[in-house]
Amino acid sequence: MDFVAKNLTKLRETNPLVQNITNYVVMNSTANSLLALGASPVMAHAMDELEEMVSIASSLVINIGTLDEYWIPPMEKAAKIASDLKKPIILDPVGAGATKLRTNTALKILDFADISVLRGNFGEIAAVLGEHGKTKGVDSAAYDSNEAIELSKNAAKEFNTVSAVTGPIDYVSNGKEIYAISNGHPMLSKVTGTGCATTSIIGAFSAVDEPIKAAVSGLTVYGISAEMAFGEAPYPGTFQAKVYDWLYRIDEELVLEKAKVNKFEI
């Protein structure tokens, strides 16, 4: 897909500011991923600065990975401000389905905010659609491509958003069309925060293209970077560092050569 390569160049030319209200586990790795790619991260969740910060950000990423009673109010306030300002909002419902707190928080944000992209694994997206038993902790317990296609389509229609269901094959839908992205590597599951980084990278691409193409661009670029990283470092610790390197090194030519993206009409 040519638009993925072009969006990579646009992103680096514009250096979008991505505001992340994310979890303690992944703040550092998420920021490094965005910096390596060519975006500017800010991790800001203080109530008193949200209005100013959201107003200057190119997009807002909300990640509920380390959710508690102190995180929820700034997430909700930022989502309301970003919706009013028509800024792209990307929601990562980490662990939805594992607990009622996570599921209900994600559902509340989906209900009142204008979410551009909902990105999660099979179990998380299934949970916000009311299908239980598919989440193990914050990891997906099972994955079936046909079910993932339907899940992505149904979530997009239900929440009037772009739904990205990630797994061995990623499926992205706006309810009218579906993209399948086959880039990536199983080693990503051995390093914490790779899904969260992907969500924030989608946030960066949301500053330069419409939601469905931003999601496809983010998943493709991160997936290719992971493939290239594993070729040089097949163990978790060095693999993580190499992913940063390839987020920095990836260019239009590599995207055009390595992208495995297919589009289907519904």
Curated annotation (Swiss-Prot):
Keyword ATP-binding: yes
Catalytic activity, reaction form: 5-(2-hydroxyethyl)-4-methylthiazole + ATP = 4-methyl-5-(2-phosphooxyethyl)-thiazole + ADP + H(+)
EC number: 2.7.1.50
A single GO molecular function term of this UniProt record: ATP binding
Disulfide bonds: none
Coiled-coil residue windows: none
Pfam families in the cross-refs: HK (PF02110)
Annotated keywords: ATP-binding, Kinase, Magnesium, Metal-binding, Nucleotide-binding, Thiamine biosynthesis, Transferase
InterPro entries in alphabetical order: Hyethyz_kinase, Ribokinase-like
Cofactors named for this entry: Mg(2+)
Pathway(s) of this molecule: Cofactor biosynthesis; thiamine diphosphate biosynthesis; 4-methyl-5-(2-phosphoethyl)-thiazole from 5-(2-hydroxyethyl)-4-methylthiazole: step 1/1
Claim: Transferase is one of the keywords in the record: yes
GO annotation, biological process: thiamine biosynthetic process; thiamine diphosphate biosynthetic process
Residues reported in the UniProt entry to bind substrate: 43, 193
Binding site for ATP: 119, 166
Function of the protein: Catalyzes the phosphorylation of the hydroxyl group of 4-methyl-5-beta-hydroxyethylthiazole (THZ).
Family, similarity comment: Belongs to the Thz kinase family.
Protein name (database record): Hydroxyethylthiazole kinase
Organism: Methanococcus maripaludis (strain C6 / ATCC BAA-1332)
Lineage start: Archaea, Methanobacteriati, Methanobacteriota, Methanomada group, Methanococci
